[in-house]
């Protein structure tokens, strides 16, 4: 029998036994080291004292690659959402920095909302579906809601900014984060895209010629809605994909939040030393009013100053005038013309007119509660002010809608309705699908109308500053105006269906001829 039968791949049994003994010795050394390490940790936790040896501390604090727990791989729906953020939101952030810092701040808040939603989805795919009305589920959405609220506050604090249309578009589209709480998320994303598109049209109108970044920004922003719909259709068609046999949602959310924080924090190897503590705060400023409750204010206290000195002088009565210095005649300007010529004070003085009549404070006006109610076949939307979210109405063709006494409100009307009225509003916008009879605008300032499908006519009376956006289906809309100014109509007849603005004429020419008055639009030649 050949000798090779007693060997294993070129090694004899003696060598294999020696290697086995060496491996066993190493394992024993590792076991002894681990036992000593655990014992030192227990003693250190009891005594609450740091380790004496800095080298040992650095050695023990370094994580071992062999003992590190295996990180669970994210499912495909999570990696796809990460790719969505990187391909859609990150380019928007970079482009917003080229436009203005306030737009960049708004995009950072929007990105923060998507990052919080990523943490939520990581927990959802590993847990059972919770009760949507539970406090745990509400707490999980709180970081997302905080970003939406901050975005609305940023918009309100920059109403005078020239980039207010950007902030409004982001604020109107931000509530799309709520798709995780509904069973039909795709249609919700579409609704908020339509609400945001009202403001993106204004961006294109104002900056199409002056800022090429604005056109690119609008394209990327609207594309982010479409790409989000594609992602939801593929992974969450009927709502968030939960795991039937998964862990409890609260535990999964805590684990997902912890992992997110660990990922964002610097690694121990890169941080060689803890940063120095912040400097102590400066000493508080001295108090303006120095009041002593122990002793009353005396003349010595009056010399020291403070509120005690003020009360001491007031309590003197008529003696307070004894401290005034007598002015000599040579120092009186009304008796010395030379002083009047050299004085910087005007000799005639400034004759101010009567004070302006104070206006009635707005707080004294009766403020009625907001009303959104269907009475019979008529919707009433009244007394809404500064609404951060759009008011959505699902109406039928036999119903009419009345919007009155509202300020800074966006109303979105879905479906075909009978008639729409906009009365006594300020900075209100209406986005509608179709209307059978038309729309009336009465005593409204700075209004906006966007028609998605068809509208036979628009009647405008005693209104100023209106912008109307018509669709291709509504190019035949008839517009009647009376006692109105600054009305502009935007039609999608440009290249790539871009909107072209047409101002409504305001000046009329009236002439008498052949026994009749003839009226025509007055045009300025040249």
Swiss-Prot record:
Record field: compositional bias (Pro residues): 275-285
Compositionally skewed regions (Basic residues) per UniProt: 357-370
One annotated GO biological process: actin filament depolymerization
Compositionally biased region (Polar residues): 45-64, 290-302
Motif stretch (SH3-binding): 169-369
C-CAP/cofactor C-like domain ranges (all copies): 369-504
PROSITE patterns found in the cross-reference section: C_CAP_COFACTOR_C, CAP_1, CAP_2
Annotated spans, Disordered: 43-72, 255-304, 326-371
Region: Dimerization and actin-binding, residue numbers: 370-526
Stretch list, region Interaction with SH3 domain of ABP1: 354-361
This protein's UniProt keywords: Actin-binding, Cytoplasm, Cytoskeleton, Phosphoprotein
Comp. bias intervals (Basic and acidic residues): 326-338
Quaternary state and interactors: Homodimer.
Protein name: Adenylyl cyclase-associated protein
């Amino acid at each position: 029998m050949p000798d090779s039968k007693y060997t294993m791949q070129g090694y004899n049994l003696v060598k294999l036994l020696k290697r086995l003994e060496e491996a066993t010795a190493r394992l024993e050394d590792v076991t002894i080291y681990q036992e000593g390490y655990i014992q030192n940790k227990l003693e250190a936790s009891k005594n609450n004292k740091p380790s004496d040896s800095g080298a040992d501390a650095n050695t023990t604090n370094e994580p071992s690659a062999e003992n590190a727990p295996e990180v669970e791989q994210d499912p495909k729906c999570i990696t796809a959402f990460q790719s969505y953020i990187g391909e859609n939101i990150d380019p928007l952030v970079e482009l917003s920095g080229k436009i203005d810092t306030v737009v960049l701040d708004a995009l950072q808040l929007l990105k923060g909302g998507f990052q919080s939603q990523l943490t939520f989805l990581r927990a959802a795919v590993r847990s059972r579906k919770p009760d949507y009305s539970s406090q745990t589920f509400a707490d999980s959405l709180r970081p997302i809601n905080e970003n939406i609220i901050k975005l609305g506050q940023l918009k309100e604090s920059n109403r005078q900014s020239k980039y207010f249309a950007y902030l409004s578009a982001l604020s109107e589209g931000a509530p799309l984060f709520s798709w995780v709480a509904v069973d039909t998320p795709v249609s919700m994303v579409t609704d908020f895209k339509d609400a945001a598109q009202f403001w993106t049209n204004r961006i294109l109108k104002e900056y199409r010629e002056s800022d090429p970044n604005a056109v690119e920004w609008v394209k990327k922003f609207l594309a982010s809605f479409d790409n989000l719909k594609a992602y939801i259709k593929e992974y969450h068609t009927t709502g968030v994909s939960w795991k039937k046999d998964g862990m409890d949602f609260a535990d999964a959310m805590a684990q997902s939040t912890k992992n997110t924080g660990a990922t964002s924090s610097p690694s121990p190897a890169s941080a060689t030393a803890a940063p120095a503590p912040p400097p102590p705060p400066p000493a508080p400023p001295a108090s303006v009013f120095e009041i002593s409750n122990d002793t009353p204010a005396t003349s010595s206290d009056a010399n020291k100053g403070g509120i005690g000195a003020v009360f001491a002088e007031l309590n003197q009565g008529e003696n307070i005038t004894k401290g005034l210095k007598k002015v000599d005649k040579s120092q009186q300007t009304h008796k010395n013309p030379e002083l009047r010529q050299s004085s910087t004070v005007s000799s005639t003085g400034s004759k101010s007119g009567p004070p302006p009549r104070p206006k009635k404070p707005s707080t004294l006006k009766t403020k009625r509660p907001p009303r959104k109610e269907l009475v019979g076949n008529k919707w009433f939307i009244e007394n809404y002010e500064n609404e951060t979210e759009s008011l959505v109405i699902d109406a039928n063709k036999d119903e009419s809608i009345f919007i009155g006494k509202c300020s800074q409100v966006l109303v979105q009307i879905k479906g075909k309705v009978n008639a729409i009225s906009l009365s006594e509003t300020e900075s209100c916008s209406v986005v509608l699908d179709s209307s059978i009879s038309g729309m009336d605008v009465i005593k409204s300032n700075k209004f906006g109308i966007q028609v998605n499908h068809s509208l036979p006519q628009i009647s405008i009376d005693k209104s100023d500053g209106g912008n109307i956006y018509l669709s291709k289906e509504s190019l035949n809309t008839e517009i009647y105006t009376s006692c109105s100014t600054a009305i502009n109509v935007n039609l999608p007849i440009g290249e790539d269906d871009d909107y072209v603005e047409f101002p409504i004429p305001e000046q009329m020419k009236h002439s008498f001829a052949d026994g009749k008055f003839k009226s025509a639009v007055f045009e300025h030649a040249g």
